[in-house]
Amino acid sequence: MGNRTSRHHRAAPEQPPPQPKPKPQPQQQQQQWPRPQQPTPPPAAAPDAAMGRVLGRPMEDVRATYTFGRELGRGQFGVTYLVTHKATGKRFACKSIATRKLAHRDDIEDVRREVQIMHHLTGHRNIVELRGAYEDRHSVNLIMELCEGGELFDRIIARGHYSERAAAALCREIVAVVHSCHSMGVFHRDLKPENFLFLSKSEDSPLKATDFGLSVFFKPGEHFKDLVGSAYYVAPEVLKRNYGAEADIWSAGVILYILLSGVPPFWAESEDGIFDAVLRGHIDFSSEPWPSISNGAKDLVKKMLRQDPKERLTSAEILNHPWIREDGEAPDKPLDITVISRMKQFRAMNKLKKVALKVVAENLSDEEITGLKEMFRSLDTDNSGTITLEELRSGLPKLGTKISESEIRQLMEAADVDGNGTIDYAEFISATMHMNRLEKEDHILKAFEYFDKDHSGYITVDELEEALKKYDMGDDKTIKEIIAEVDTDHDGRINYQEFVAMMRNNNPEIAPNRRRMF
């Protein structure tokens, strides 16, 4: 279940992770965060300036104020660029959303709400700041703080050593964001490690929450029914389509579990399997490294991951927990090095597997995809060879599929491997074919041979780089990280057995001693 909005900017290569600055003292439960600042009015527009249909104010040319540089990231609805303020020379990130992609009223409302929420939350140290919003005839442009310090997990991995105390400091910053959001009537709904970036490469850089595209305003006791979020981090009540802001606490608890162990608490070979595990609620505290982790840490995780949302700790109660406090009980001894290794693998593995599954889909016989080819043709109404979001939106109901708007967007994001905003034939097949067919031995062999260009029986670093770059799937550093993690015999290349283990999710390095539950 992917999130349905575009990603925020990703920064340059990461530096060793910082020891984050402490958050406000947890005993200040009733602390009032700074009042939301009113957005700075845009410069006066010409008398005949047209009104923007998204922001509802006179259109402005963002390029008159900012110089656009390189692309930083790309998502379903837009592209994020590095921009420079012409008058001051200061650098920012600009999320540019093409208005032609905002085809429905809900799309427009989502962008408006994202702008409103980011302005509303302005002033918090751990929330990325929106500096301005501009609309012209082609796009809505959101100017934001530039986060150049890298993703949360990346910096931990780069450092290579880590302690419970460091995990507690990071968790404090994450929960402080939740506390501020909830106290100001905002429900984030998509808390996950990828949505936390460090502002700078310095050791004391603050951690910043980004991407409020799924966030909503809420009142105490209000419940929601739409299925949103990301599979590993989604709360059980969200899957039951009756949930409130307590779901943010669950997501933060999942992040804390991963910070301490390197793997998610609810793990399976498919998204449906993950959802079943979430609903069952069994949390593994017996496998390594949990026996050596403090009781205080385990106590907090358990209280954040209670199945009944009413029994979960509130953000204020978490900040007062003895383990997480700045002067609290979290020990400073390093966590087992395998935690870093497993975290690295969890972050990197899916990219290679997604490409491999697409390769498998491209080699399936007509017999194996009976019905799927015709379904693709019926959805591809303009015969372009690709399916757009609009074609999915209009075509699925005609096929008898009852699916919500948010689920349609999630399907698009999950299936769109190369991130170009459309689903091609192979992407469609790999997303809709039952996994047991994709994992047949002969299909995996074909995928392996696709990467093994010289038929040596091994996939080398160069072969992997060549194949993945065709799909724009990561930089050299990430590619080398992937091969290092899949290469369990450490000979610098991937043999067929290692490739099969990766495809079938049986790699013991990912989930040691974890029993199959499905």
Swiss-Prot record:
Chain residues carrying a lipid of type N-myristoyl glycine: G2
EC number(s) stated in the UniProt entry for this protein? 2.7.11.1
Composition skew (Low complexity), residue ranges: 26-35
Q: What class of enzyme is it?
A: transferase
Where's the EF-hand domain? Answer: 367-402, 403-438, 439-474, 475-509
Q: Where is this region: Disordered?
A: 1-49
In terms of domain of life, where is this protein from?
Eukaryota
Keyword list, A-Z: ATP-binding, Calcium, Kinase, Lipoprotein, Membrane, Metal-binding, Myristate, Nucleotide-binding, Repeat, Serine/threonine-protein kinase, Transferase
Region Autoinhibitory domain, residue ranges: 330-360
Identify the InterPro entries for this entry: CDPK_Ser/Thr_kinases, EF-hand-dom_pair, EF_Hand_1_Ca_BS, EF_hand_dom, Kinase-like_dom_sf, Prot_kinase_dom, Protein_kinase_ATP_BS, Ser/Thr_kinase_AS
Give the residues the record marks as binding Ca(2+) 2. Answer: D416, D418, N420, T422, E427
Expression across tissues: Expressed in roots and leaf blades.
CDD domains per the record? EFh, STKc_CAMK
Activity modulation comment: Activated by calcium. Autophosphorylation may play an important role in the regulation of the kinase activity.
- Domain writeup: There are 3 contiguous domains conserved in the CDPK subfamily: a kinase domain, an autoinhibitory (junction) domain and a calmodulin-like domain. The autoinhibitory domain (330-360) inactivates kinase activity under calcium-free conditions.
- The protein's name: Calcium-dependent protein kinase 1
- Give the species this sequence originates from: Oryza sativa subsp. japonica
Give the gene name.
CPK1
